């Protein structure tokens, strides 16, 4: 079976499972609460091996690669499922690239089976400073930090860039959840007060810049795929609503002006899919891999937010009420836009890359 067919089968299985286990009714009910993640759903997807998707086969994972993880994130975005998958995926990539044999042996199995939930600070964050064997400082806006059991944080030690793998329950570590409009995910700040650090906690990358770029590439593709899934989901929900909502004695979906708006959104999302698939299909060592990922992220997240925003309008007055799903997807789309570089930041980075080429 070809890789393309394998990815299609995987994507179908992801969507079938989430449509059964996380239907819209659950998404709406969850959005009204204050949970940090769906623990029962996480246990289910962990049993199915989803966190192990990008873990190498040599370390007990599935080794499926970026196309498979993009398909997974698209399905998660479609369902607006509150799962801390991105932090786990980035932690796997970080360990595979910079971890010692002992560190991989210690940490990858927990990431693969879902018993360890990870968060990874953004590559652009100011690094912490390791002073001897002690760590002090604060890292803000870390995705999945409130639910993580293992924290992966950028740092410097003796002037060299390193990453730290710190247990969330280590003495001196505290995490504070930040308020978010998007209730399907969590972000928090991590405070470290005289935290003891030894060699088992320190990951030393051979090429820190290349590693930062690879983490950014993977995050950009995942967020673009998530946005693509969310954009399609909110459009499908809106089309269903247009077919049943009546005004002036007719279903509003029969109005040509609304048909044109839906068609425009569908066309925009299909074009966005091409960007995601192109970026996910590139080899990580390709000179254009990061450029393709950043291009996809800045464009697709914007398109998804625009689609979700207009779908609220197409729903009319109920569009932003808690009983309907459009607001969930708009909030998720706006967070996707902001994570790992806003559109303006990424456009500046893209311009610099093109100028240097």
Q: Language-model features: where?
A:
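Cytochrome P450 C-terminal beta-domain/meander region
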Residues: 125-136
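A generic local secondary-structure boundary/capping motif
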Residues: 95, 107-109, 127, 139-143, ...
